[in-house]
Structure formats: structure tokens, C-alpha cells
Design a protein with these regions (language model features):
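Contiguous transmembrane helix-bundle modules in multi-pass membrane proteins
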Residues: 219, 339-355, 361-491, 799-801, ...
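Periplasmic/ER-lumenal interhelical loops and adjacent helix-loop junctions
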Residues: 56-59, 63-68, 72-75, 249-253, ...
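Start-transfer (signal-anchor) and selected internal transmembrane alpha helices
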Residues: 1-43, 248, 252, 432, ...
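A cross-kingdom signal targeting lumenal/periplasmic-facing segments of multi-pass membrane
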Residues: 110-115, 528-659, 663-672, 676-700, ...
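Membrane-interface coil-to-helix junctions
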Residues: 33-141, 161-183, 275-280, 288-310, ...
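Active-site-proximal, structured, solvent-exposed surfaces of multi-pass membrane proteins
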Residues: 10-19, 695-977
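Membrane-embedded helix bundles of polyisoprenyl
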Residues: 30, 134-148, 153-238, 249-272, ...
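Extracytoplasmic/lumenal acceptor-recognition loop(s) of multi-pass membrane glycoenzymes
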Residues: 91-93, 99-103, 461-486, 502-574, ...
Length: 977
């Protein structure tokens, strides 16, 4: 091996050359396999950008990161200072660049290459990097095999392809490109461990720990757990329980790992700090003893084939065809490879038990993103057992025949494992069994080399088979869920922000502003460099999350939200100037926003369509009718509204509301109170507290069930047919916003079959009796029974609420939901109306019981709104300059006031007033404030990522220690040579 110590240069050169044929063979086979596996994307004209997180997060973050890197390099070349802005107002209302985008782009060392790629080619870079990560994961697996003295090239090739193209990669690797990274690091980490155990240099372990920690804090945690299990097993195996002998190797591994973490601290510390302060950490996720029965029903077939069970738990195995007989042969061999057997039993046990998935997920919810470790193990078992496929005798063949037959019967008996793709793989295995059986006859069958070639070909084809059933149109058509290559960059640029920018330009708006909208594409603000009220990144501000929780926003994810429910007061207090929506959308527009105009945001795409049609018809340009028809099909039209009461980035209060008094108010009272006084944790020196004048009123109503499929039972509604509805009759207030306020809202679902159990709790009107059941056709009864057997409660529901031609949706999650936050209190804005609302319709989407503690209708008169906002606008921050992580402005005050800055609160911000340090207060839960005396003031704000300086210091010490380790180690090696 290239790393072997004590060898002459000639021997080292020979070892390097001996691996070149393998490298060539692996590269060739990988290329062929990748072309076949991903051909379904290319034939469909698809990129590897998933339409959900791939498009909404990963790709947009990568484009931003490449521009961010170039901006930093430009600052060095032009300004002669290296400066990377660490704050950007285009991350929602504003967020830390390093900690927010680390998970998506910044952590991956390979993404540094993006600085060299123009934005127009970024989609190709994105796709190529996915293939490169997969290639490297298989290559590094091969290196581990060689480190462990596995010298059969075909065996290692089969294992590498199995590891590189298992179902986890086919499914999750293109969804989330950085899920592939830990697959690259794991074999290198284990090689590093093996080197330390062999008394060799620890450099590789130190460097890979540093790279893994920098790359992704989440998967670094997973890698640590996997490595700890591996090290424990290897130490016990090597030293046979002699605990004293284990101490020194364990100390060396721990020391090398700690040094690697120190070297990574420049990014690792800030990101971990942000993670530990994230609102999701405080959420007590629901624990379950077992997965839903349906998930277990998929698992037999999932071992060898893609079944579609993956979902949010990433229960994705889909190993290559020979891994199943390899595992069988492993357990057939007595008193050998004991550690592999133990690891396999542990791995399968963890795979079956949700608590293990919870542990691997940082004690959050249960998910199996760690199963790449199981894929590594199974692929290595295949490499280890491979020689048995050449030396197999009749008893081995009978043993495999019985095992495969049992596996076949299990798949046939279980509904969700009764899938074609599994039977195809089993057919290949039985065919292989025939070939092995033939070889047991004297002088018959294929040669040793030929049988290995056939086995390797079967491995490759089984991977392609899994890809077919996952990606092909005739299979699950998974590739259809990815973004089209054609016009991708045009669509990337043609966003609602173009309409906002056009209106801002028309209005000659030069100062800082924000925009908002409902159901806009996620994170388009980032690449358009506009600040907005939408956000969808994994790490979020705990202050913003707390604020939205206080306001009972209608959302069930703490880190993904659109706007502020179009509530006028909150939207204005957030310095929002524009509201944008699709032209024909019926989205609620906040009170006080006036229509400015409608803009087409994709004119280039429209022109391309017109040019293509003209060329097809052989004319200079389409006729008027065709032009109108094509425009109607292609145009993306957005309507922009401007806030008549817009507030700037900094506005002032003359009074404050103590946090303790604020918390005594209801959520709707809180939003009204914030128009009258800024909410502070501590009393300012020169401003008095306020006693807010609250005008919101609860309105009495009566409930009418619109059919016998929904029944009111006290504080609950029992629904026996989906999409059943109720109507609230009331006399709402005029010139008011109207809210439906729900407290303690929960849902308990039931299957349709259960309705026939004569249980008045779920069927209070006895409409589903035994007689009704007996009258159902046999096929209907059979289907209801089968569905009930695998039924589990819906994880999310969308309750539709409408009034006066306006509608809103209340998304409700249950404890079954992977990211259940525990939120049960909601205030749903039904918009502003000059006339009072007379009825509210609530539509329940699923069968079950909807319970609540209280349900109220609240009207918020807007009579005082204009005066309250204008009072905040009397004295504002002017001449505002926003330059990444620096904000400055000036203000003139006649009396002492509190300057509220609508910048999300963070300890990374510092302020000076007239050149003197000033204390930044947390204001209105999520913003910042400065207490100012009367007079003219210059305000300057500066941001630096929390713990970044500390991380730099630790990294510097770590690098120096690493250099010292190298010097000491090499001197010792030369001395001992």
C-alpha cells in the first residue's frame, strides 16, 4: 500500500502502479453504471435538482456561495483586504451567511470550485459534483478494502459499485447532494483509524476529522457515532477484552480526532453555536416504539430493491443483488468474521427500532439518514465473502436455495414487499444459484474468472434495475420530480422579485425595503438580493421563531414560513413596503396596501416561445391571435401592492411595554400593543411605559354543520367523511380584520374501516352500522380491511377556512409528523373588510375528531391604525446605508426615544452612537432597539458571526499542534529507522 511504512521507494512505487489497473477498471465501470443509472434523467431532460429542497435551497445556496466567494476574492484584489460579508438581509429578513448556508454549500470543500463557474453554467457544475461525490465514495471504499488486505480486484469492484449506487444514493443523493459527503468521509475515517491501530502516522485521521467537521455538523455527529461503534468493535476484536492494552490506541485515536475538531473550529464552533440556539432544539419530538406497520411491510423487499418506503425516514437500502447471499454466507461460516456478524446484527437492529434513528438524529425525531453506514457494512461483507462464491459446494447451494426460497415466500405474503423489482432480483439470484450449482460438478460450469465476471455484471445490472424502478416512467417516475434542464436559468431569474424591483424602480425607491407575499417560490429573495418575510433554511433565528409562536402563526414548521399571515400591523412593523402575488391569485392582501401594477417577469421566455413558433411556421413573427395565445400560456404575471403606511428600517417609539406585561396579553392583543409601545426585557432610562389601548373584540357566533358527515360534540367536531364542513354564523365588525382564533387544536384520525365498529365516539349518528358493512360489496370490504391493516394517522392536514370571498389554509400537524413542533394555538387571518363578516366556513380534510379548547372569532378594528403608524414615522433613521454586515444612518430627535431597528436580533450585532459603543436591546421579541437622547445622532451597526473569532483562535492552535505532531512524528520515524 502507498501508506505502508518501512518500505523502500521502489516497493512503494510498485504498490502504486499495481493499483492503476484497478483505478482504470473502477473508473470505467463507474462511468458505464452512472450512464445507465442516470440515463432516465437525461432522457427526460432533467437536471439533478430536486423540485423541492434541491431547487428551493441547495441550488440557490450554491449560486449565492459562488458569487460570495468571488466577492471575497474581489475585495482582496481591488480593495486589498479579504472580506467575506457574514450577514445578508436577503436571507429572509436577514441572517448569518456562514451558519445559515453552511449546511447547504459553504461546508463542502468541493464547492470551493464553484467560484470558478459562471452562474449560467452552475446547473452543470451541480450535476457533475453529485457524480463526483458518488465516484469518490466508491473509490474511497476501495481504498479501505485495500487497507484491510482485500486484494481481489473484482470483489472490491463489486463492493465499491454496491456502496456507490445503493438505494440511499439513488433516492437521497440527488435530493440532497450533501447526503453523499459522509459516504466519502466514512471509509477515509476508518482507514485513518486502522492506521493508528497499526501504529502508523495519524495524519489522515486528523485531516479527515477536520474536513468532516467543517463539511457538515449534522453528519459529523453521525460519523462520530459510527466511528465510535467501529473503534469499540475493532479494539475488542484486536485485544480480546484486554482492557489495559486498549488504552493507548484509544487515547491516540481520541487525541487525533480532538486535534481534527480543533482544526475545524473556525466553522464548526459558529455552526454548532447556531444549532444549539435553534428553536427546534427545544422542541420535544414525539418518541415511538415502532415504525408504522406499513414501513416494516416494505422492508423485506427493500433490502435488495427500491420499494418507495424511503420517505422522510430515509429508510433506503436497495443493496446490490449479491449482498443477500453474501450475508447468508457470512453467517454460514463458523468462527470467522465474528465482528462483521455483530456489526450486521447491530445495524439491522438499529434499522428496525425508531429509537436508534432518534439517537443517530441527535435525539430529535427518528430518521435513518445514518443507513449509509449499513450500506458500507453490507458492501464490505460482499467483498469479504466474495471468495466463497468461487469455492461454493453443494451444501452451500442448498443452504442458499432454502434461504432464497424463504425470502421469496416472505415477499409474496407481505403486500408491500410483493413488488416486481424484488422478484426480478430474486430471479437473477436463482439463476446465479444454477451457475454455482453447475460448478459443483466435476469439470462443469464456468471458470473462476468467468463466474466472477458474471457476478460483477449481475451487481451492475441490479443497480440499474433499482434505478429503473425508481426513476423510469414505468416505475416510480422519481426523475419527474426534478427540474427541467431546458430554460432552467431563465426560470431561476424569472421570479416575483423582478416585479417588485420594476415597481421600486418606477417609484424611484432607493432606500432599504422589504417585500412579502403568500405562497411565493422559496428563497428567491437570496439570489435577487432583496429582503423579504419568507424563509426556508434549516437553521433559523430563535427570536423570530419565538415571535411567530407568540403570534400563533398558521404554520407547523419553525424554520419555513411565508410572511406574517398578511396581518397589517405585523407586516408594517417589519418595514415591509411591497406585497406581491400572482395576478389571478385570490391571496389575501394586507390592509393598507394599494395596487401599483402588474408585471411580466419572464419576458425572455415569452420571446423565446414566440420566436420558436415563428420559426416553426416559417414567418417573421406570429399573428396577433397566436401571440396572445402563447403569451397566455407562457407569461408569469405578478401584481404588486405598495404599503401606504410603510415604515423604514429604523423607526422610533416614545414609550415601551415591559415584557412581563406583554406576555399577559393574547396574541392578537400583542400585535395591537406593539403599535403603541416597543416590547423590551428591561426598562429604558428616559422613556415611560405604555398602557396599550386594545380595541380587538370577540364576536359571538353559532355553529351549523353542513351535513350529517360532521357532528359537534362539545369542544370537538367528529368527521366521518373527508372534506366535510361547518359554518359559523356571526355579525362581524365593519372596517376590521377578522380572525378565527383556535386554542388547543388537535386531531385524532381514524380509518374508514374503524367507523363500522359501532363506536359512538367516532360515529355519533350511527351511520356506519354492521348492517351497512354487510351491504357493502365484497371488494369494497376487502379493500377497507387491507387499507386499515396498514393505515396510520395522517401526519399533516390542511384545514380550509373562508369568509366573505376570502380564504386561508390552516396547516395542522400531528405527533405522527416527523417535524412535529407541538403547536396547537392558531390565529387565522381572514383579511380586512369594509363590511362585517357574516359567516365563516371551515372544511375538514380527513376523517377523525378535531378537538379544541376554545374557538373564537375576533375582529380588529383598523380605526386607530393610521395614527399609530404615523406616530412611529415621526422620527426615523435616515440616510440609511446597508452594506452586508454593516448598517449606518442618522436621526434627529427632539425628545429621548427608542429607535427600533427591524434587524433580526443576534448577539453578533454591535452598535455605536456618535462613535461611542451603545447597548443593543432585544425589541418586540425578534428585533433590536437603541435608546437615544434628544439631538442629532449617527448610528452605526456592525455584525460578526458569534464564536467566529474564538473558532479562528482554536483553529490556529490546532494547526500549530498538527504541525508539531508532524515534526515530532517524522523525527521519531527517522530516529527509529
Amino acid at each position: 500500500m502507498p501508506w505502508t511504512q518501512g518500505e523502500s521507494p521502489l516497493i512503494k512505487q510498485h504498490r502504486k502502479q499495481s493499483k492503476r489497473p484497478y483505478l482504470f477498471a473502477y473508473t470505467l465501470l463507474f462511468t458505464v453504471t452512472a450512464l445507465l443509472v442516470y440515463s432516465f434523467y437525461w432522457m427526460a431532460g432533467k437536471s439533478f435538482i430536486w423540485v423541492v429542497d434541491g431547487w428551493d435551497q441547495h441550488f440557490k445556496a450554491l449560486v449565492y456561495y459562488s458569487q460570495w466567494l468571488r466577492a471575497g476574492a474581489r475585495s482582496l484584489l481591488v480593495e486589498h483586504r479579504l472580506h467575506f460579508p457574514t450577514w445578508d438581509f436577503a436571507l429572509g429578513q436577514g441572517a448569518d451567511v456562514l451558519t445559515t448556508l453552511h449546511y447547504y454549500a459553504i461546508g463542502d470543500p468541493l464547492n470551493l470550485l464553484s467560484a470558478l463557474v459562471p452562474t449560467r453554467w452552475m446547473v452543470h457544475f451541480y450535476d457533475i459534483m453529485i457524480l463526483l461525490r458518488i465516484y469518490l465514495s466508491g473509490l474511497f471504499f476501495s481504498l479501505y478494502c485495500f487497507q484491510m488486505k482485500k486484494q481481489n480486484g473484482m470483489a472490491v469492484l463489486a463492493g465499491a459499485l454496491s456502496y456507490a449506487f445503493c438505494d440511499f444514493v439513488l433516492f437521497a443523493g440527488v435530493q440532497h447532494p450533501y447526503f453523499i459527503n459522509p459516504r466519502m468521509y466514512l471509509p477515509l475515517l476508518l482507514i485513518g483509524v486502522e492506521k493508528v491501530l497499526a501504529g502508523k502516522r495519524p495524519y489522515l485521521l486528523i485531516v479527515i476529522v477536520a474536513v468532516a467537521a467543517v463539511s457538515n455538523f449534522y453528519f459529523f455527529y453521525v460519523l462520530v457515532l459510527l466511528t465510535v461503534i467501529y473503534v469499540a468493535g475493532r479494539l475488542i476484536s484486536l485485544y480480546h477484552g484486554e482492557w489495559r492494552q486498549m488504552g493507548m490506541p484509544l487515547l491516540k485515536i481520541a487525541g487525533a480526532s480532538a486535534l481534527g475538531v480543533m482544526m475545524s473550529a473556525v466553522l464548526f464552533l459558529p455552526v454548532v453555536g447556531a444549532f444549539l440556539s435553534d428553536a427546534r432544539i427545544a422542541v420535544d419530538q414525539n418518541s415511538i416504539l415502532f415504525y408504522p406497520l406499513r414501513q416494516y411491510a416494505y422492508m423485506p423487499a427493500e433490502f435488495l430493491a427500491h420499494t418507495g418506503v424511503s420517505g422522510y425516514t430515509y429508510t433506503a437500502l436497495g443493496f446490490s443483488v449479491l449482498t443477500f447471499p453474501a450475508v447468508m454466507m457470512l453467517f454460514r461460516q463458523k468462527k470467522t468474521n465474528t465482528l462483521l456478524k455483530v456489526f450486521f446484527v447491530i445495524g439491522i437492529g438499529c434499522f428496525l427500532i425508531p429509537f436508534a434513528g432518534k439517537v443517530f438524529n441527535g435525539f430529535s425525531y427518528a430518521t435513518n439518514r445514518w443507513c449509509f453506514g449499513l450500506a458500507f457494512l453490507v458492501a464490505y461483507i460482499l467483498v469479504t465473502v466474495w471468495p466463497s462464491f468461487v469455492t461454493m459446494d453443494k451444501r452451500d447451494c442448498r443452504y442458499l436455495f432454502v434461504g432464497l426460497s424463504v425470502y421469496l415466500v416472505v415477499c409474496l405474503l407481505i403486500r408491500y414487499s410483493r413488488v416486481t423489482q424484488a422478484f426480478i432480483v430474486l430471479g437473477v439470484l436463482f439463476a446465479m444459484l444454477v451457475l454455482w450449482q453447475q460448478r459443483t460438478k466435476q469439470g462443469a460450469g464456468l471458470s473462476d474468472t468467468a463466474i466472477q465476471v458474471v457476478a460483477l455484471a449481475a451487481t451492475l445490472l441490479s443497480v440499474v434495475n433499482n434505478s429503473f424502478w425508481l426513476n423510469a416512467y414505468s416505475g416510480s417516475n422519481y426523475a419527474a420530480r426534478f427540474v427541467d434542464q431546458k430554460d432552467l436559468m431563465q426560470n431561476f431569474s424569472a421570479t416575483a422579485e423582478n416585479a417588485v424591483k420594476a415597481v421600486a424602480k418606477q417609484k424611484k425607491v432607493t432606500e432599504f425595503y422589504r417585500y412579502t407575499g403568500h405562497e411565493l417560490p422559496w428563497n428567491t429573495d437570496l439570489n435577487q438580493h432583496l429582503s423579504s418575510l419568507q424563509y426556508y433554511w434549516s437553521l433559523s433565528s430563535p427570536q423570530i421563531s419565538a415571535f411567530r409562536w407568540d403570534m400563533n402563526m398558521r404554520e407547523y414548521l419553525l424554520y419555513r414560513y411565508h410572511g406574517l399571515d398578511e396581518r397589517a400591523s405585523l407586516t408594517t412593523l417589519a418595514s415591509t413596503r411591497f406585497f406581491v402575488k400572482k395576478e389571478k391569485s385570490k391571496d389575501i392582501v394586507p390592509y393598507g396596501f394599494s395596487k401599483v401594477g402588474t408585471r411580466v417577469v419572464n419576458r425572455s421566455a415569452v420571446q423565446n416561445a414566440l420566436d420558436a413558433f415563428a420559426e416553426e411556421q416559417g414567418t417573421d413573427k406570429p399573428g396577433a391571435a397566436d401571440t396572445k395565445r402563447l403569451q397566455k400560456k407562457v407569461e408569469k404575471r405578478y401584481t404588486v401592492y405598495e404599503n401606504d403606511y410603510a415604515l423604514p428600517l429604523g423607526y422610533t417609539y416614545s414609550r415601551y411595554l415591559p415584557q412581563a406585561e406583554y406576555q399577559k396579553l393574547s396574541s392578537l392583543q400583542k400585535q395591537e400593543a406593539m403599535l403603541q409601545g416597543v416590547v423590551l426585557d428591561k426598562a429604558p432610562q428616559h422613556c415611560a411605559s405604555v398602557q396599550p389601548q386594545l380595541t380587538a373584540q370577540e364576536v359571538p357566533f353559532t355553529v351549523s354543520c353542513n351535513s350529517k358527515d360532521v357532528t359537534q360534540q362539545g369542544n370537538s367536531f367528529v368527521v366521518t367523511k373527508k372534506d366535510s364542513s361547518i359554518t359559523l354564523k356571526l355579525e362581524g365588525l365593519s372596517a376590521s380584520e377578522t380572525y378565527l382564533s383556535l386554542r388547543g387544536l388537535t386531531y385524532a384520525g381514524t380509518s374508514e374501516y374503524t367507523l363500522y365498529n359501532d363506536d359512538e365516539t367516532i360515529d355519533p349518528l350511527n351511520r356506519y352500522t354492521q348492517t351497512d358493512w354487510d351491504l357493502l360489496p365484497y371488494n369494497d370490504r376487502k379493500k377497507l380491511k387491507d387499507d386499515h391493516w396498514y393505515w396510520h394517522e395522517p401526519a399533516t392536514l390542511n384545514i380550509k377556512i373562508s369568509a366573505a370571498g376570502r380564504s386561508n389554509t390552516l396547516p395542522l400537524s400531528t405527533p405522527e409528523y416527523t417535524w412535529f413542533s407541538g403547536r396547537q394555538d392558531f390565529d387565522v387571518n381572514l383579511g380586512y373588510g369594509e363590511e362585517g363578516v357574516s359567516s365563516i366556513k371551515i372544511t375538514f380534510p380527513s376523517i377523525g375528531i378535531y378537538r379544541f379548547n376554545t374557538m373564537d372569532v375576533v375582529c380588529q378594528p383598523m380605526d386607530n391604525y393610521a395614527d399609530q403608524v404615523n406616530a412611529l414615522k415621526e422620527d426615523v433613521l435616515e440616510q440609511i446605508k446597508v452594506d452586508g454586515d454593516r448598517v449606518s444612518g442618522s436621526i434627529q430627535l427632539d425628545t429621548p426615544k427608542l429607535l427600533c431597528l427591524t434587524i433580526p436580533y443576534s448577539k453578533g450585532w454591535s452598535a455605536t452612537v456618535d462613535g461611542q459603543p451603545a447597548e443593543l436591546l432585544c425589541a418586540n421579541t425578534m428585533y433590536m432597539a437603541l435608546e437615544l437622547d434628544a439631538g442629532q445622532h449617527t448610528v452605526q451597526l456592525h455584525y460578526q458571526t458569534p464564536l467566529l473569532n474564538a473558532g479562528m483562535g482554536v483553529t490556529a492552535v490546532g494547526v500549530l499542534l498538527f504541525v508539531a505532531v508532524i515534526v515530532v512524528t517524522e523525527r521519531r520515524k527517522r530516529r527509529d529507522a
